[in-house]
Curated annotation (Swiss-Prot):
Pathway: Carbohydrate degradation; 2-deoxy-D-ribose 1-phosphate degradation; D-glyceraldehyde 3-phosphate and acetaldehyde from 2-deoxy-alpha-D-ribose 1-phosphate: step 1/2. The gene is deoB. GO terms for biological process: 2-deoxyribose 1-phosphate catabolic process; 5-phosphoribose 1-diphosphate biosynthetic process; metabolic compound salvage; nucleotide metabolic process. Binds 2 manganese ions. InterPro entries: Alkaline_phosphatase_core_sf (IPR017850), DeoB (IPR010045), Metalloenzyme (IPR006124), Phosphopentomutase_DeoB_cap_sf (IPR024052). It catalyses: 2-deoxy-alpha-D-ribose 1-phosphate = 2-deoxy-D-ribose 5-phosphate; alpha-D-ribose 1-phosphate = D-ribose 5-phosphate. This is Phosphopentomutase. Its cofactor is Mn(2+). It is found in: Cytoplasm. Keywords: Cytoplasm, Isomerase, Manganese, Metal-binding.
Length: 407
């Protein structure tokens, strides 16, 4: 029985890539800078001391970081026994966004340029805004700018509740984000508005990767909170990802846990499981791994590293999340059967010590474990697509166009 489990620690980069300067990210290092802050006692909120990741270290995390940067992260054991195969991978795609990283992991790099809304204020074309107001029968809109999602709620949340005007905003990513109150505006109405926005952006040729529904609750600035009912409306990958090949060529199954299905616009997904928060995502993943049959991929995105701690530049929170993940990791490994493989990786960086609030262009770790996987270094990889090619080879599928199998 063959099964593959893919675990994406969203934004867990391990050091700037050679082309990071082009993105303003030269010197960024999500893991390295978190470890450095922990070792200096600068991340002792809710946790304490050096970054403690013994299980990920045994799989080769510290060694992968050394391969990418030339050094072992501060406080981590560079001499630990290695039980997994490890590599560090460079992104071939043109961006440093979630769809690009995930599509490339599944064998389809993004070799075109996404569209972006680059103006910090008055970010969106008036023609687009007018169409949204007309089609969705809106009283107007708020925002129309670049912002962090939590900051804009404090700035505009109360006005949104009073006026019923949705909050439109974007970032350095190829996104159109809409924040609305779940109760006063309505969750279904927000989803309908996002569908309209997706249609207008596609028909208008804006080439925007995602429309993101950002529902929130609360009654005043300071206590607004985003809920777990986020929904991403992505465009489809330009060619079949390895997930779809497994379904089409082997009649296989692909289980999405978390936001995976949204990222791939449901391409190749046969079952969707929603969960919010690290522990809930872990619990859902464990349940699906236990139930998975032959020719199945269980694919989980652990979004909190990115959304809760990376973008918010919360070093201590990110460190605590990593340590929680590491403590629970053995629960996943014990479910890996004789012919199974489990892969731990990331889709980009989001260094919580870096300027601004955006992603960082970094190498990602590729940590592979399985009873038949030979431990040791798999070296530098030129593309994340090596993961997709490995999965294709493992299941006996036709070759992906990009990538070389890890083994």
């Amino acid at each position: 029985m063959k099964r593959a489990f893919i675990m994406v620690l969203d934004s867990f980069g391990i050091g700037a890539t050679e082309d990071a300067e082009r993105f303003g990210d030269a010197g960024s290092d999500t893991l390295g800078h978190i470890a450095e802050a922990c070792a200096k006692g600068e991340a002792d909120i809710g946790r304490k001391g050096p970054l403690h990741l013994p299980n990920l270290t045994k799989l080769g995390l510290a060694k992968a970081h050394e391969g990418a940067t030339g050094f072992i992260p501060a406080g981590m054991d560079g001499n630990a026994e290695i039980t997994g195969a490890y590599a560090w991978a460079h992104e071939l795609s043109s961006g440093k966004d979630t769809p690009s990283g995930h599509w490339e992991i599944a064998g389809v790099p993004v070799l075109f340029d996404w569209g972006y809304f680059t103006d910090e204020k008055n970010s969106f074309p008036q023609e687009l805004l007018d169409k949204l107001v007309e089609r969705a029968n809106l009283p107007g809109y708020l925002g129309n700018c670049h912002s962090s999602g939590t900051v804009i709620l404090d700035e505009l949340g109360e006005e949104h509740m009073k006026t019923g005007k949705p909050i439109f905003y974007t970032s350095a990513d190829s996104v159109f984000q809409i924040a609305c109150h779940e109760e006063t505006f309505g969750l279904d109405r927000l989803y309908e508005l996002c569908e309209i926005a997706r249609e207008e952006l596609t028909e208008g040729g804006y080439n925007i990767g995602r429309v993101i529904a950002r529902p929130f609750v609360g009654d005043k600035a300071g206590n607004f909170q985003r809920t777990g009912n986020r929904h991403d409306l992505a465009v489809e990958p330009p060619s079949p990802v390895v997930l779809k090949k497994l379904v089409d060529e082997k009649g296989g199954h692909v289980v999405s846990v978390g936001k995976i299905a949204d990222i791939y616009a449901n391409m190749g997904i046969t079952k969707k499981v929603k969960a919010t928060g690290l522990d809930a995502l872990f619990d859902a993943t464990i349940k699906e791994m236990k139930e998975a049959g032959d020719n199945t991929i269980v694919f989980t995105n652990f979004v909190d590293f990115d959304s809760s701690w990376g973008h918010r530049r919360d070093v201590a929170g990110y460190a605590a999340g990593l340590e929680l993940f590491d403590r629970r990791l053995p629960e996943l490994l014990e479910l890996v059967g004789e012919d199974d493989i489990i892969i731990f990786t990331a889709d980009h960086g989001c260094d919580p010590t870096w300027k601004g609030t955006d992603h960082t262009r970094e190498h990602i770790p590729v940590l592979v474990y399985g009873p038949k996987v030979k431990p040791g270094s798999l070296g530098h990889r030129d593309t994340f697509a090596d993961i997709g090619q490995t999965v294709a080879k493992y299941f006996g599928l036709s070759d992906m166009e990009y990538g070389k199998a890890l083994f």
